[in-house]
Regions:
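Compositionally biased terminal segments of proteins
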Residues: 1-180
Length: 180
């Protein structure tokens, strides 16, 4: 991981924790925690921001902390934050694709060490479901799912995974990938 990403993750984690914003890293940056390691430049983050007022306050605090959100709108499920210091972009999801975004999801996220920072990452079960439930799911997403199933075998909460997969309408594809 480059020093720019390490710096960004450290400052982002401090900002979110300091402002008591529940969050979790999702997408490709979460994958090495549970599955295959592959290169990705996308930093996707889900933040628990439930009202327009919370959103407005978040944007103000983010800009004070060095993150710019030029096209921010609470009505959009995702927006881009740009870090002034590194120029790197963060996709901030208010309503992430493929994840039932609720208290149970937050309770199941895991704290993982990234470089010098402890950050929250989506649970392996919710990672799997989110990859399968994406409207633009591709072969790489299915490979990512398989790598997590193999690496985390014996530690995944199968009952929770299958319940969430059924709710998202992806239980059949999960079972097919699991058999491969």
């Amino acid at each position: 991981m480059s020093s720019h990403y390490e710096d960004l993750l450290a400052r982002l984690g401090e900002f979110l924790a300091g402002n008591k914003i529940d969050y979790m890293i999702i997408g490709g940056f979460a994958l090495p925690s549970y599955g295959a390691i592959r290169v990705t430049a996308d930093l996707d983050l889900a933040a628990w921001i439930q009202t327009p007022l919370q959103f407005k306050n978040f944007i103000l605090k983010a800009e004070i902390s060095g993150f710019k959100a030029p096209t921010a709108s609470f009505s959009n499920p995702v927006m881009v934050l740009t870090d002034h210091k590194t120029g790197l972009e963060i996709e901030l999801w208010l309503r992430p694709d493929g994840i039932v975004w609720d208290q149970e999801t937050l309770d199941r996220r895991r704290k993982i060490r990234f470089a010098s920072s402890d950050l929250y990452v989506v649970s392996p079960e919710d990672f799997i479901v989110s990859k399968l439930a994406r409207p633009d799911r591709g072969v790489q997403d299915e490979k990512d799912v398989k790598s997590v199933l193999v690496r985390m075998e014996g530690t995944i909460d199968r009952k929770y995974l299958e319940r969430r997969a059924a709710r998202a309408g992806v239980l059949a594809i999960l079972k097919a990938i699991d058999r491969i």
